[in-house]
Amino acid sequence: MANYQDITFALAGVCQAAKLVQQLAMNGTVDQEILRTGLSTLLQTAPEDTLAVYGGQKSNLKLGLETLMEQLNGSDVTLNRYWLGLLALEGKLHKNAQAKSELARRIQYLPTQLAHYDLLDEQMLSTLASIYVDVISPLGARIQVQGSPLYLQQLMTQNRIRACLLTGIRSAVLWRQVGGTKWQFLFSRRKLVATAQQIYSSI
């Protein structure tokens, strides 16, 4: 039987990444602590449980839970395209053993770099962006990000967007691991909404 709490945590992670991408594309900036929460998920390769991926605190997924509840009610077409696009990309990654191996190899070296740089330093964001470009983008079904050209043309913003997309893939991988399927959006949407509301109200 599906564990809807774990599935909802992971989906909230995907939606939180998608929301950060949207905010960066439109405004060029995001809440730095929410960004740090997302980036930190990439370092959680052997978590004790699902919530541990997000620092063990439900409040770290507040934005994602809000976004998930809005999306399950179909409120934002662009955002809908982002988070469903992340799930589609993860599906392609899941079927590509070489890409999965390369992604794991690149992620493995992140702690070494963190000995020299903070997670939010430009060098780290550039490294994470390059992982997305090198490993995820070639899988196809590329996500077309819409926003202000003023921000989208800036390398710093591009790196942040790609780093956030990578964190979205991380949560999408987790979503699959804990039993998430696209059928649930058709047949268990009410259950997902109710679970998200329950978690949100406990924050």
UniProtKB/Swiss-Prot annotation:
Gene: hflD
Lineage of the organism: Bacteria, Pseudomonadati, Pseudomonadota, Gammaproteobacteria, Pasteurellales
PANTHER family xrefs: HIGH FREQUENCY LYSOGENIZATION PROTEIN HFLD (PTHR38100:SF1)
Entry's family note: Belongs to the HflD family.
Record's subcellular location: Cytoplasm; Cell inner membrane
Stored InterPro entries: HflD (IPR007451), HflD-like_sf (IPR035932)
Record key words, sorted: Cell inner membrane, Cell membrane, Cytoplasm, Membrane
Membrane topology label: Peripheral membrane protein
Gene Ontology CC annotations of this record: cytoplasm; plasma membrane
Record-annotated membrane-spanning stretches: none
Name of the molecule in the record: High frequency lysogenization protein HflD homolog
Organism: Histophilus somni (strain 2336)
NCBIfam families xref list: PRK00218.1-2, PRK00218.1-4
